[in-house]
Every structure is written in C-alpha cells, then in structure tokens.
Amino acid sequence: MRHRKSGAKLNRTSSHRKAMFRNMVTSLFKHSSIKTTEAKAKELRKLADKMVTLAKRGDLHARRQAFSIIREKDVVHQLFNDAPSKFASRQGGYTRITKLGLRSGDAAPMTTIELICDEV
C-alpha cells in the first residue's frame, strides 16, 4: 500500500527524478518560465517554493541548502539577490501553473510553470 507516501514517482528511478527536478528548478529560476507536463509541474512547484523560501531567509545555511539543489552559482546568487524584493508580500504560492492543452505526440497534458513576481 502507498498510504501517506508523498511525491509522484513519474516512472523514473529516484536518482533520475532527483536530477530531472534539479535541472528543471534551475531552468525555472534562470528563465522564470518553463513548459512541461502537468504532473512534473505540480511536483516542481513544491521544490521551487522551497527554494524561494530559502532565498527569502537569506542566511548562509539557506544559501548552502540552495546550492545542494540548484548547483549553478550564478542562478543561486541571482535568486538570493532578487527573491526578497520580488516575493516580499507573499508567504507562499510563488509559482503559477497554466494549462496549455495536450501534446500532439502522446496527448500528455502540457502546462507552463512561471514565477509570480510582486515587482511594481
């Protein structure tokens, strides 16, 4: 039984899943919006929100925790410099998922996931 197990497996090994989400969260913060399947976007939202929360905290330990996930120095620096001002008024829900329809090859539901910024 799979009671109380959180997170989707997405038909991948744990190492593949971990590497895929690390790459996806890096791309999300680099480009501020990416196109992916609905299931991946829903799982990515959890990780992205955790990274923004770490960036808002801003201390050295939070930065090191972010480096363990993101692994690109310039993306982490950009996130930690911009996040406190971009997401100052939000306590969570830093991403938005928008449905795009079905992919033509396999009819997988496609979405865009983007960062919601509060800048004026």
Curated annotation (Swiss-Prot):
SUPFAM superfamilies: Prokaryotic ribosomal protein L17
GO CC aspect terms: cytosolic large ribosomal subunit
GO biological process: translation
Recorded superkingdom: Bacteria
Gene3D superfamilies, per database record: Ribosomal protein L17
PROSITE patterns for the chain: RIBOSOMAL_L17 (PS01167)
InterPro entries in alphabetical order: Ribosomal_bL17, Ribosomal_bL17_CS, Ribosomal_bL17_sf
Keywords: Ribonucleoprotein, Ribosomal protein
Gene Ontology MF terms: structural constituent of ribosome
Family according to the record: Belongs to the bacterial ribosomal protein bL17 family.
Subunit (UniProt): Part of the 50S ribosomal subunit. Contacts protein L32.
NCBIfam families hit by this protein: L17
This protein's name: Large ribosomal subunit protein bL17
Gene, per the UniProt record: rplQ
